[in-house]
UniProtKB/Swiss-Prot annotation:
GO CC aspect terms: extracellular region
Post-translational modification: Contains 2 disulfide bonds.
Tissue expression summary: Expressed by the venom duct.
Compartments, record wording: Secreted
Record text about domains: The cysteine framework is XIV (C-C-C-C).
Keyword entries, A-Z: Cleavage on pair of basic residues, Disulfide bond, Neurotoxin, Secreted, Signal, Toxin
Organism the protein comes from: Californiconus californicus (California cone)
Organism ancestry: Eukaryota, Metazoa, Spiralia, Lophotrochozoa, Mollusca
Claim: Ribonucleoprotein is one of the keywords in the record: no
Gene Ontology molecular function terms on file: toxin activity
Pro-peptide region(s): 21-48
Sections of the chain in a coiled coil: none
Protein's UniProt name: Conotoxin Cl14c
Signal peptide region: 1-20
Length: 67
């Protein structure tokens, strides 16, 4: 197995442990600076944190960023 594949497999295995970058809660959000805050949670693309409706969610079903 080459190095790239091993790295990707390792990344996939460790992602659930970080809960999609929610590590920012441990130190007030400054772990990776502004980039980290903009990235938000990988799974919800930051919409829920910003309380915005994601584009794929009908406005009538949207409640504070959650569908």
């Amino acid at each position: 197995m080459n190095v790239t594949v091993m790295f990707l497999v390792l990344l996939l295995l460790t992602m659930p442990l970080t809960d999609g970058f929610n590590i920012r809660a441990t130190n007030g959000g400054e772990l990776f600076g502004p980039v980290q805050r903009d990235a938000g949670n990988v799974l919800d693309h930051g919409f829920q944190r910003r309380r915005e409706c994601p584009p794929w969610c009908p406005t009538s079903h949207c409640n504070a960023g959650t569908c």
